[in-house]
UniProtKB/Swiss-Prot annotation:
Family: Belongs to the nucleobase:cation symporter-2 (NCS2) (TC 2.A.40) family.
Protein name: Nucleobase-ascorbate transporter 8
Organism: Arabidopsis thaliana
Transmembrane intervals: 44-64, 79-99, 101-121, 141-161, 167-187, 189-209, 229-249, 295-315, 368-388, 399-421, 433-453, 470-490
Transmembrane helix listed as a keyword: yes
GO molecular function, one term: transmembrane transporter activity
Tissue: Highly expressed in ovules, endosperm and embryo.
Claim: Transmembrane is one of the keywords in the record: yes
Membrane topology: Multi-pass membrane protein
Gene field: NAT8
Any GO CC annotation of this UniProt entry: plasma membrane
Top-rank taxon: Eukaryota
Pfam family, one: Xan_ur_permease
Annotated localization: Cell membrane
Region (Disordered): 1-20
Amino acid sequence: MAGDGVENAKPPQKQEDLQPHPVKDQLYGITYCLTSPPPWPETILLGFQHYLVMLGTTVLIPTMLVSKIDARNEDKVKLIQTLLFVSGINTLFQSFFGTRLPAVIGASYSYVPTTMSIVLAARYNDIMDPQKRFEQIMRGIQGALIIASFLHILVGFSGLWRNVTRFLSPLSAVPLVAFSGFGLYEQGFPMLAKCIEIGLPEIILLVIFSQYIPHLMQGETCSNFFHRFAVIFSVVIVWLYAYILTIGGAYSNTEINTQISCRTDRAGIISASPWIRVPHPIQWGGAPTFNAGDIFAMMAASFVSLVESTGTYIAVSRYASATPIPPSVLSRGIGWQGFGILLCGLFGAGNATSVSVENAGLLAVTRVGSRRVIQVAAGFMIFFSILGKFGAIFASIPAPIVAALYCLFFSYVGAGGLSLIQFCNLNSFRTKFILGFSIFMGLSIPQYFYQYTTLETYGPVRTSATWFNNIINVPFSSKAFVSGILAFFLDTTLPPKDKTTKKDRGLVWWKRFKSFQSDNRSEEFYSLPLNLSKYFPSH
């Protein structure tokens, strides 16, 4: 019997079957990478889909600002159009001359606390005319944005950010990139649940269309079709369902907040929109005004945005199937992002722009990381910002539908950060400490600031100088900022620093991408058009 047992025993598993998954410096499975555009019909549809996704934040942020000032719907529409117009221009600049990644540049939540503090500043309370008060506030935000933009411009174009990010390893990038997505969870289900009857169907349909149906369909063409256009399919179906509920009187006797969240004719955007209007600089009744406190506070928000953008750019490069972004290219992109903030200030957009996290997640859903798609999306932004009536139709998509999209997009960006762990040695106690401690503190510190602000209506740092309060409270309320800065500090200062540690940190994998010339693929993905790299070389 013992002999029979030996004879029937399974042969030992081959050693190669037990090997870990191979490390990939480029993400495979992307149908169209950074430099390979889809056919034009698909490119146009995919570009329109990116435009739809970025509209959510473009509408939500001006709506929040206007609600605190009691301004007219016409002013809200004017803000939305301006922000959309500037976002389109900034996206084109970024794709042609900045990082050259398929990154949509849209409204940033990083600046909202600071802009809100300007909106609520006591110096505007003496202005009795609501319209004049609104215009004066907008001019104050303009002045703060114009000066704060030079932080990005100087840090980026001087090469300072290049020198900083050369010390960034895969290990320290994990919390930074992960929390660029996961850290925005407040914009997900909590906002979806404001109208659960349309938010929940949207997220269910989106997951079915993007994850289940492609695997059930026969043939690669059908599978890719649902991957690429899951957002359009699900949004159209649920938007139509919400419209039927609206005209059927489902929300006629509900609370005003429910109507704002659920109705498809909310907020008077369509009726207040002009047919044609071209946004222009200095449009708020006079020149920008400058306040030292507002400027310092806005610069703090700008620095937070700079750090968060770095994490999102890394995620975008991953989902575009490009090589890790060289520090010189990243610094160049930060400089152009600063130029975009300057445009926001000059045009009076009411908020600054940054790389869009939700559109970075959409790259993963569609598995299309083409630069041309994003350039087409920028064209849609500019076009619909001028043709206000048509743009307002799409801007009236209920916020819970947008929040349902965020649940998937932010998850993908966060997962892109976690995927960088493949370059690190998780059996190292040094790695475990840096990852665990930075992630925990990235959750715990902002939560303390949030709870304190919720209970006391002001942050833990409270002095007579509001600008100083914002300089401290705003950065430590950002999960990506806290976890990213902490991981970067620990990773660069914590001993030992030997060859084994470099391998544990993942530096051996990213070493050849620290210099632009070290890998031929950097030239393919990140070189400037029109032979401009000859005159503006990357190092």
